[in-house]
Each structure stands twice: as structure tokens, then as C-alpha cells.
């Protein structure tokens, strides 16, 4: 994930946008920070999904086939 300073800056810019609006430079900064945040979030979420195994109440592995294939490619699953 993003470091704490970047997260604070994203929130500062969001609050300023609501209160008084942003300059062009601040708007560009906000866009870049949001893109960086989304990229980091998606990467983290993808890793979480790739390392997840789904087990039903009977104890059967019901992990989606697409996830199983990715796990095999990454040597997570045999």
C-alpha cells in the first residue's frame, strides 16, 4: 500500500476540493496520487485472491478454476 504521507495528502486534497476547490496543479497531483493508490490497492487485492482457497461447509475445495490455475502458475497449488 501507499505510505502514510501519500494517504494523508490524498485526504487533504479531497477535503480541500470540497471546501474551496483545487488549483490545476493540485488537481493533477490528486489524479496521480489516486492512480497510484488504485494500482497499489488492486495489486494487493489480486495477491490476496491468488492466495485464497475456498472451502464449502462439507470441506470440499470450491476455489474457482481460474484462481486455481493462477495458483498453479505461481507454485502455490500443486
Curated annotation (Swiss-Prot):
Q: Which Gene Ontology terms of cellular component type are present?
A: cytoplasm
Q: Which UniProt keywords apply?
A: Cytoplasm
Tell whether Cytoplasm is among the UniProt keywords.
Answer: yes
Would the keyword Ribosomal protein turn up in this protein's UniProt record?
no
Query: What Pfam families is this protein classified in?
Result: DUF896 (PF05979)
Organism domain of life: Bacteria
Its localization reads: Cytoplasm
InterPro entries in the record, alphabetically? DUF896
PANTHER family for the chain: UPF0291 PROTEIN CBO2609/CLC_2481 (PTHR37300), UPF0291 PROTEIN YNZC (PTHR37300:SF1)
Protein family membership? Belongs to the UPF0291 family.
In Swiss-Prot or TrEMBL terms, this protein is called UPF0291 protein MCCL_0996
Q: What is the lineage of its organism?
A: Bacteria, Bacillati, Bacillota, Bacilli, Bacillales
Amino acid at each position: 500500500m501507499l505510505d502514510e504521507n501519500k494517504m494523508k495528502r490524498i485526504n487533504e486534497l479531497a477535503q480541500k476540493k470540497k471546501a474551496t476547490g483545487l488549483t490545476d496543479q493540485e488537481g493533477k497531483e490528486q489524479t496521480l496520487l489516486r492512480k497510484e493508490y488504485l494500482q497499489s490497492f488492486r495489486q494487493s487485492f489480486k495477491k490476496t485472491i491468488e492466495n485464497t482457497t475456498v472451502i464449502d461447509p462439507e470441506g470440499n475445495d470450491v476455489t474457482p478454476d481460474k484462481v486455481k490455475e493462477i495458483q498453479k502458475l505461481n507454485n502455490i497449488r500443486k
